[in-house]
Amino acid sequence: MTSSIPNVTHLKQLEAESIHIFREVAAEFDNPVMLYSVGKDSSVLLHLARKAFAPGKIPFPLLHVDTTWKFHEMIAFRDQMADKHDLDLLVHINQEGVDMDINPFIHGSAKHTDIMKTVGLKQALNKYKFDAAFGGARRDEEKSRAKERVYSFRDENHRWDPKNQRPELWSIYNSQINKGESIRVFPMSNWTELDIWQYIYMENIEIPSLYLAKPRPVVERDGLLIMVDDERMPLEEGETPEMRSVRFRTLGCYPLTGAVESTANTLPEVIQEMLLTKTSERQGRVIDNDSSGSMEKKKMEGYF
């Protein structure tokens, strides 16, 4: 299986670096947690965490912040993985947001993301008093993530200050925090999207089938192909879902995630597309286009 991937050594180096980071954090922090958003990066992150502590169990829980607007397949896949690998899975929903009926159609992507994702995440971190949170973000995804450290320091309000980051020389990480402070940890910072796909293929990692092309009901809005995942999505006048062969490069709340037209329904075909693509995987994420520098603003407020 591995012979068709030219940079296996490179992938093994990335794997070793990520495993080292997992073990460092587990040894240095009192109460770590792994953020599990169910996408391809989370699937690789889970695989790496299991490798880091094999043959034992992962020594920290997984946290999924459920906005109630994820693709149904993502939730089913999440529960399937939790059962299969005997994971300590925590699911948190911002009940205040649910009570206010916050949703992306009425309130827009920015408010929905802030209340159901950012506030929801901070609620969970405060509730369980986690001092370190693993995430699957990579530097190649987006410009604000490109300048974030592996150990990303957060103050007592979970805020990130991009102008006040700690140096990381020779893979030496500064884990010193005061009471109430925390860090976000990104073991896959140095991976690329292509690395992720090649590693998924090499290690035979399970992922949601949303990443593979098949006919799906979509409508075109603001230049994005939005999949009609359930009856809650209001159709505009004259709008009719049509079946198109599409897949997703990134996953989030279904009303805020654009599909790409594709016929790639196997991992080798997806990898071939990655070799030829000229666009960012996050071009289909509505939340990244709320305003200029919106991702950095969200992260400064406590976003993933």
Swiss-Prot record:
Q: Which GO terms describe its molecular function?
A: ATP binding; sulfate adenylyltransferase (ATP) activity
GO annotation, biological process: hydrogen sulfide biosynthetic process; sulfate assimilation
Which keywords, in A-to-Z order, does the entry hold?
A: ATP-binding, Nucleotide-binding, Nucleotidyltransferase, Transferase
Instruction: Describe, as the record does, how this protein assembles with itself and its partners.
Output: Heterodimer composed of CysD, the smaller subunit, and CysN.
Matches recorded under CDD domains: Sulfate_adenylyltransferase_2
Instruction: Name the reaction it catalyses.
Output: sulfate + ATP + H(+) = adenosine 5'-phosphosulfate + diphosphate
- Biological or metabolic pathway of the protein: Sulfur metabolism; hydrogen sulfide biosynthesis; sulfite from sulfate: step 1/3
Q: Matching PANTHER family, A to Z?
A: SULFATE ADENYLYLTRANSFERASE SUBUNIT 2 (PTHR43196:SF1)
So what does this one do? With CysN forms the ATP sulfurylase (ATPS) that catalyzes the adenylation of sulfate producing adenosine 5'-phosphosulfate (APS) and diphosphate, the first enzymatic step in sulfur assimilation pathway. APS synthesis involves the formation of a high-energy phosphoric-sulfuric acid anhydride bond driven by GTP hydrolysis by CysN coupled to ATP hydrolysis by CysD.
Gene name, per UniProt, is cysD
Please state what the protein is called. Sulfate adenylyltransferase subunit 2
Give the family per the record.
Belongs to the PAPS reductase family. CysD subfamily.
The residue stretches assigned to a coiled coil in this entry are: none
| EC assignment | 2.7.7.4
User: What InterPro entries is this protein classified in?
Assistant: PAPS_reduct_dom, Rossmann-like_a/b/a_fold, SO4_adenylTrfase_ssu, Sulfate_adenylyltrnsfr_sub2
Name one matching Pfam family.
Answer: PAPS_reduct
